[in-house]
C-alpha cells in the first residue's frame, strides 16, 4: 500500500518540501532564519488582517482608528504592537539571512539569490507603506520625503511623484492607495517566497563548508523541523518580551502626534531598519546622486555572484575575507546610527566616510582579498 504522504498530489508537494527533503547534515543555526522569516510573514498577515478589520484609510479618521484599536478593541494593543514589532523582527531576520548568504557564498545559486533580492525590495516597499498608515507626523513627513525623491528622475520625475500621490501633495488619495498596496503586497510576497523555495529545492541547500553535500544528506523532518521550532520559540520569547515591556522602543515618539502638513518635525527619519540606506542617501549632496546611491546600496547585492573571485565558495576557511565581512557589518551598524542623527558636524563626515567604505569594501576590497587568498593557497 502506498503512503498517502508520498502519493497524494497536494500532500506530495509538502512532503518533498518539508518532510522528505534531503538536507545537508551540517547546516548551522544560520540556516534557521529562512523558516523564521516564513513564520514572521504568517504572523504579519494574520495580525495585519485583524488590524485591517478596524482601520479606516481616511486622513481625518486614520489616526483615531489606530487609537481606537489600541484602546477599545479586545487585545487591539497586542495585535497592533505585534504587527509593528513583528516588522522589526522581520527585518532583523532578513538582514541575518542575507548576511548568511554572503558569508557562506549562497549567492552562487543565482536564481534563488535574485528572487531573494526582489523579495527584499517587496518587503521594504510593504514596510514603508505600512509606516504611513497610522497617519502620525513621521508617517506623513516620511511619506512626503521618500516619495519626493522620485522627482529627481530626469524628465518624468515630477509627473511620477504626482501620479503616486494622486494629487499635488500626500493626502487622502495617497493614504487610500498605500493601504490597498500594503494589504495586497504580503500575498504577492508569499507567492514570491514559493518561487524562492522552488529555485532553492532545484539545487538543494548550501552548507557552512560551501562544498557539495550530496554524499551526506539527512531528511528535513524530524531533524530540522525540531531545530526550526526551537528557533521559533526563541523568536516568540523575544517578540512577546518586546511587545509586553517596551513596545515603543523601536518606534518614533513623533508618530504619536497626528499628521500636520503645516508643521515639519525637526528630524525626519524612517524606521530603524531603513536608516543605513537613509544615511547613504543623505551623505551625497546632490539629489539625483543620493537617490542613485540609495538604490545601488541594495542593488549591489546583485553583483555578489559576479564579483566572487575566490576558489572557495564559503568564507569558513578564508580568515582575511572574514575580517572584511565583519568590517562590512560594523560599517552598516555605523550607517544605521548615522541615519538616526541630525544633519550636522561631525555626523555628515562620518556618514560620507561610512558610505564610501560600504561601496569600497564590497566592490574592491572583497574581490581583491579573495584573489590574494587564492595566491596564498598556492604557497
Curated annotation (Swiss-Prot):
Binding site for heme b b562: 83, 182
Binding site for heme b b566: 97, 196
Domain of life, per lineage: Eukaryota
Cellular component annotations (GO), alphabetically ordered: mitochondrial inner membrane; respiratory chain complex III
Main location: mitochondrion
Subunit structure, interactors included: The cytochrome bc1 complex contains 11 subunits: 3 respiratory subunits (MT-CYB, CYC1 and UQCRFS1), 2 core proteins (UQCRC1 and UQCRC2) and 6 low-molecular weight proteins (UQCRH/QCR6, UQCRB/QCR7, UQCRQ/QCR8, UQCR10/QCR9, UQCR11/QCR10 and a cleavage product of UQCRFS1). This cytochrome bc1 complex then forms a dimer.
Official protein name in the record: Cytochrome b
Gene giving rise to this polypeptide: MT-CYB
